[in-house]
Curated annotation (Swiss-Prot):
Subunit structure, as described in the record: F-type ATPases have 2 components, CF(1) - the catalytic core - and CF(0) - the membrane proton channel. CF(1) has five subunits: alpha(3), beta(3), gamma(1), delta(1), epsilon(1). CF(0) has three main subunits: a, b and c.
Record membrane topology: Peripheral membrane protein
NCBIfam families per record: ATP_synt_epsi, PRK13442.1
GO molecular function, one term: proton-transporting ATP synthase activity, rotational mechanism
Lineage, highest ranks first: Bacteria, Bacillati, Actinomycetota, Actinomycetes, Mycobacteriales
Membrane keyword on record: yes
Subcellular location: Cell membrane
Protein name: ATP synthase epsilon chain
Entries under Pfam families matching the protein: ATP-synt_DE_N (PF02823)
GO CC annotation terms, alphabetical: plasma membrane; proton-transporting ATP synthase complex
Amino acid sequence: MADLNVEIVAVERELWSGPATFVFTRTTAGEIGILPRHIPLVAQLVDDAMVRVEREGEDDLRIAVDGGFLSVTEETVRILVENAQFESEIDADAAKEDAASDDERTAAWGRARLRALGQID
């Protein structure tokens, strides 16, 4: 299968760039799965999104993202976000505490991290 070129960039760092076979996330229009040769589009991510990047012969990447935008061409997926963390960087206890916050923005970031950990859908 042909690969997608995927770039995930947060404000303070380029998080990840490389080939992938599939990308899944949630936009304000709903869930989306992207395969190579997908129709071009631009979409806004939900505030509590998780991006899953499937790679041939490697473990999936699970990344919590804090809002942002998704740009898709036939061969490239670019995800531009305010903040992002790999699953391995997430403190589960802090994410749970944030998810219970009265502040909606903090709660959304907590939920995104819990999604990346696979603790909520």
